[in-house]
Amino acid sequence: MEHKKTMLDYIADCPEFIRNNVADSAALTKPLVDEYVSGGYKNIWIVACGSSSNGSLCARQFIRRHLKCEVKIVTPFHFVSSENDFSETDMVVVVSQSGYSLNALDAIKVIEAKGRRCIGGPLP
């Protein structure tokens, strides 16, 4: 039987993932950087919950300081149900630890339904 990873497994894996992510940071962030630069965006929305939201809160100040733009963080539930009035000058980023959060996938569907491009893996 396959071992299903728990939060403790992810915590134990963190040092290696951090080293790899820092080493590959330019390649990992290139699609988002290219989209931001070419899109003429003025603000960023981050759609995230749980630990993804916590990480996004940490990134928020860094992004604001370096990009000189406003960063709004909203949960997938609120984004899908009511708070999705982003404009053409708002870049919307959905963050999910696993990539399979149903609420996050629903948020992506809202973004795509508004004719916006989504970057990342294909939806299951």
Describe these PLM feature segments:
Residues 1-39:
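Cofactor-/ligand-binding subdomain signature composed of acidic, glycine-rich
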Residues 27-30, 37-124:
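Glycine-rich phosphate-binding loops that contact phosphosugars or nucleotide phosphates
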